[in-house]
């Protein structure tokens, strides 16, 4: 659990499966490809390994499991074509819109660290600009050139890059730079949780119930003094965690 008297100054978010229900679409389109090769649907245990990883890394997981005759890039390209028709129907996850609005209204710095590449990010959010415009320039996508190849989640780089953007914005406003320990990172995937913890941030893990159940005895390795879990973003209490009365420090 979080320390009782700690107050955080910024909130950083993953996107897929946390802010938008894209994981349902990912699973559906993956199963369409697997079915074409006569393979079984994607099991939750493999799905858990894919979540939070950049596209090519996630593709490698499913290819290694299924032995389908595709390269990771071929798999990514095929999924891109199939998924394109679904993105316009993508819906926010419960509590996501209200939380982002609440943070924005209180002047809390927010940022987005998504493994989605820029093209996918734009397609997923085109009809949700009223939510994602709140992040301003504090967005790093999985194909951002500042993230070295092979350094996506579970490495900490993407969170630290987003924090750099937040601090650049704070400097322009005459505010002090924040350290990772002053930030909360919201994640739904295990690789993402590991990534944010490695960055030195406090983590709020909002997992799919099936993923959480799959973890079993390893739960204590994930949920510790640096990480806690919530069933939904709607359960997050900003007054408990955030320094909303002295945000200009």
From Swiss-Prot:
BP GO annotations: pyrimidine nucleoside salvage; rRNA catabolic process
InterPro entries cross-referenced by the UniProt entry: Gpp1/Gpp2-like, HAD-like_sf, HAD-SF_hydro_IA, HAD_sf, PGP-like_dom2
Assigned GO CC terms: cytosol; mitochondrion; nucleus
Chain segments annotated as coiled-coil in the UniProt record: none
Pfam families: Hydrolase
GO molecular function ontology, one term from the record: pseudouridine 5'-phosphatase activity
Stretch forming the signal peptide: none
Similarity section: Belongs to the HAD-like hydrolase superfamily. CbbY/CbbZ/Gph/YieH family.
Name by which UniProt lists this protein: Uncharacterized protein C4C5.01
Organism in which the protein naturally occurs: Schizosaccharomyces pombe (strain 972 / ATCC 24843) (Fission yeast)
